[in-house]
């Protein structure tokens, strides 16, 4: 079986969010299952220079962008048993950020068609083309509407994964012709039209043979108006080919027993290193070094979606009622960045914030934390809680999306559960759950069992990769759609 991953970002090359982690880890796991997996992505100037120097030009192709024709270089790099092809176009991809440019519609129209042209240039006859989020949704659409008419592409199946439905790639209707090179018949409600514009995410959904989301609960949520982002009708029409497959993390990369970024290593059986890491991070941030004070952390974008408005409502109360410390790492909305700067000043022995992102520091924080707070308004899957489980930072989460699928509430009567959860997006429900978690922290023997359950929870890609393998196989064979 041959599978092509078409992605807009991928670790270890470039990353802006969780999509890059999936693109970096899942192909490796599929390769271990004997699937020939190739990844295609843009050759951004943001990729480290030493990595770009190792790329080898292997082919080139011409790509239609509306009425124009653009040159595309194709460069190859082998990494961790996976072949990566980087599609090169200096004007589109030599930018100071991955996204957020005035011509993103054109950039990813080019990339989507370039992916299909590059397949032919490389003579790579993929059985399945697997695309991700709006940036590559037009790959699925162009394959179905145009390229499958050519013998080289006619047997190829396509899968489209929704990582976050909130970001859809919406552009003026002129893009149908001027960027995608399609005629106006594609601007209908049954095709690309979306409230007077065109929608790349919608195109990927309607054209793919299979659509997946990054958790089973998120799959069900996006069929409702609350989570559906005005695409719930389109998704409902596709629900027989809509599957939720839970993301994992790279458990070799995220391993407290071997992580080069942390000061002391440990595992689920011997957690003495975790205690030492806590003292290191308390000292680093200028907090009182005290093992008996529970340390809570948040590593996230500082946005309302991540629940920071809930934090803002009750953090004062928590500091007044509980002996606890909080470390926050992230950037985001100015309202929350300024709030945590104020809280650092108001509670210098309780609250510290690093406004920015620093991967090695984030690992140190996970390894030091007793609790990890993630009260998201919605969360398609979530990466933070998976890393937290792996590092023994017991998650406190809202029951939504992938948080619901990965964190189970601790039950005192049975000893089951790997974290603490609350259902409603409500500040005082969150506060009550945090206080409950803190009460168990001081019962050392019981707390040790909770931490061990967290650390032994399987967060790897192994099971999910087998589910994708099954999905691909069933689609290639033309069998029933939804995985049961």
UniProtKB/Swiss-Prot annotation:
PANTHER family referenced in this protein's UniProt entry, alphabetically: ALPHA AMYLASE DOMAIN-CONTAINING PROTEIN, GRANULE-BOUND STARCH SYNTHASE 1, CHLOROPLASTIC/AMYLOPLASTIC
UniProt pathway: Glycan biosynthesis; glycogen biosynthesis
GO biological process: glycogen biosynthetic process
Catalytic activity: [(1->4)-alpha-D-glucosyl](n) + ADP-alpha-D-glucose = [(1->4)-alpha-D-glucosyl](n+1) + ADP + H(+)
Gene: glgA
EC class of the enzyme, as a word: transferase
Lineage top rank: taxon: Bacteria
Annotated binding of ADP-alpha-D-glucose, by residue: 15
EC numbers: 2.4.1.21
Protein name: Glycogen synthase
NCBIfam families according to UniProt: glgA, PRK00654.1-1, PRK00654.1-2
Species assigned in the record: Bacillus licheniformis (strain ATCC 14580 / DSM 13 / JCM 2505 / CCUG 7422 / NBRC 12200 / NCIMB 9375 / NCTC 10341 / NRRL NRS-1264 / Gibson 46)
Keywords: Glycogen biosynthesis, Glycosyltransferase, Transferase
One term of GO molecular function: alpha-1,4-glucan glucosyltransferase (UDP-glucose donor) activity
InterPro entries documented for this protein: Glyco_trans_1 (IPR001296), GS/SS (IPR011835), Starch_synth_cat_dom (IPR013534)
Function: Synthesizes alpha-1,4-glucan chains using ADP-glucose.
Stretches assigned to coiled coil: none
Family statement drawn from the similarity comment of this UniProt entry: Belongs to the glycosyltransferase 1 family. Bacterial/plant glycogen synthase subfamily.
CDD domains: GT5_Glycogen_synthase_DULL1-like
HAMAP family tied to this protein: Glycogen_synth
